[in-house]
Every structure is written in structure tokens, then in C-alpha cells.
Amino acid sequence: ALHTPFGISGGAQAMANNVLVTLELNGGFIGYGEAAPLPPYNGETQAQAMTVLAAAQAWLVGKPADDWRALATEFRTRGGAACGSAQCAFEMALLDAVNRRDGVPMWKYFGGAGTALETDMTVTTGSPEQAATDARAIRDRRIRMIKVKVGGPKGPGYDLARLVAIHGVAPDSPLILDGNAGVSRADATALVQGLR
């Protein structure tokens, strides 16, 4: 169960029904990936992800892992494109296994110059008071950037009240507004105008 429901404009989810993927290469090197289907966002389910991933076992065994891009493309063409979370989990597990085998950290494999990464944390849909509480908890975790889910039936005025509450407890935090396709053009315009 999640600490708090993860709410977006299309609905909320109180339980994360994810799928852990393990992929073993010849030589015993194991990679891990995770599918995180979110039914309110894209309709994907845990069962769908598991079905897509299980189907890959029939053709994957014995394939060379070095050309991971070709395997990722084959995964998509053999049904993986229908479930983005399964595709992500497969690619993560494959890359993790290859990098473990080669003794190369993922960041270095992709040409990264460091080991630090700035990320954000999300304030989901909810009341202005809850948004302020969540933003304060994010700041207490020393996360600077805050993503805010916006959109839904209460309209841009409600989202603006939430943003004001967040700014009140985290005035120096950059905010990322995320409507997940749940904001109309008119509501987006009203929201942007309200931010001025």
C-alpha cells in the first residue's frame, strides 16, 4: 500500500500493483526491472504487464544480450508496445543485467559525468491543506523540485489554491505542473493566467 493515495486527474490509486522482473544472462548475471502500471493514467494493469512479460520468455531465451536496442525493439513488436510499463521493466532488467556482467554502472554506460542526479517528488491531487502538508514533507526530505498534479473536475481555481498553499511552505522550490492529459486548453490557459 502507498503512504497516501496517488491521485491524478483521471483518478487515484491507493495500492501500487507493480511487477518485479528478473532477467538472467548466461553466466548467472541477474538484472532487475520494475513495471509500474497505473490504471487511472493509461489503463494498464498488473495482469496485463505480467502477460506481456511472460510472453517474451518464449522467444527471448538464447538471444544475445549485447544488442539491447534490438531486443527492446523486438519486445515492442512482439506485443510489448501494448504495455509501456512492461516494456520499461524489460529494458531496465536487460540493461541492469548487461551492466552487472560488464562491471559498468548504468550512469557510466550512458556517458554520465557524475553520480548525482536531481529529481522531483509529486504532490498528488487533493485539498490545498493536503498539498501544503505533502510539500512540507518533500522539503523535509531535502528534495528541492516539486511536481504538482493538476486538472480534474474542481477546475483551475482549485489548482491555483493548491499551488499557493505549496508556495507558502516551499517558496524556493521550482514547481512542475503535470496535468496528465486531464487539463483542457481553456483550463490550462486559465491556470497559466492565474499564475501571473
Where are these regions (language model features)?
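Metal- or metallocofactor-binding catalytic centers and their adjacent structured scaffolds
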Residues: 24-101
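Short, Gly/Pro- and small/polar-rich lid/capping loops
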Residues: 1-17
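Metal-dependent enolase-superfamily TIM-barrel catalytic cores that perform enediolate-based chemistry
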Residues: 108-196
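Asparagine-centered polar/low-complexity signal
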Residues: 17-18, 180
